[in-house]
Swiss-Prot record:
This is Large ribosomal subunit protein uL5. The gene is rplE. InterPro entries: Ribosomal_uL5, Ribosomal_uL5_bac-type, Ribosomal_uL5_C, Ribosomal_uL5_dom_sf, Ribosomal_uL5_N. GO terms for cellular component: ribonucleoprotein complex; ribosome. One of its GO terms (biological process) is translation. Gene3D superfamilies: 3.30.1440.10. One of its GO terms (molecular function) is tRNA binding. It comes from the Bacteria. It holds the Pfam family Ribosomal_L5. The keyword Cell inner membrane does not apply. It comes from Corynebacterium diphtheriae (strain ATCC 700971 / NCTC 13129 / Biotype gravis). Part of the 50S ribosomal subunit; part of the 5S rRNA/L5/L18/L25 subcomplex. Contacts the 5S rRNA and the P site tRNA. Forms a bridge to the 30S subunit in the 70S ribosome.
Amino acid sequence: MSENYTPRLKTRYREEIRTKLNDEFSYENVMQIPGVVKVVVNMGVGDAARDSKLINGALEDLTLITGQKPELRRAKKSIANFKLREGMPIGARVTLRGDRMWEFLDRLLTVALPRIRDFRGLSDQQFDGHGNYTFGLSEQTMFYEIDVDKIDRPRGMDITVVTTATNNEEGRALLRELGFPFKKADA
């Protein structure tokens, strides 16, 4: 890419969403307007303790989905009941920032989430009190980068969207404006 390219969700955030949030919460300073800092995609592979080949599939899937090489996560301590030893690989994690983060969020919201069967929206109760949002996906096949015929097994993942919002209301407003499909509150 020789030309300057800005992801469309980032452009929409800068041009439309920031002004809407400023009007809604009336901030004293433009630096107080919440934004997205990073997106962390975590894939736990507990079965890798018994079969070490399973972690390779998770690493490949995460690489395809995020476009970035995942970090191998290892067990911090041994747990005999799970047949787990300290240092064994049990998961993979990717931290996305900058343009890759905006591209991933755009693909997640416009392509992946609508492909989930019987999808009724994300819960808006999974905020951590500081405006960060975490949700889980049960399988990786909703991403179009994954070839359904080549996956060895369905794997879920946790996705955390870290924002600069100071509370849940600001974080919820930011993510709703970005296009996160939250469930409607039933009266």
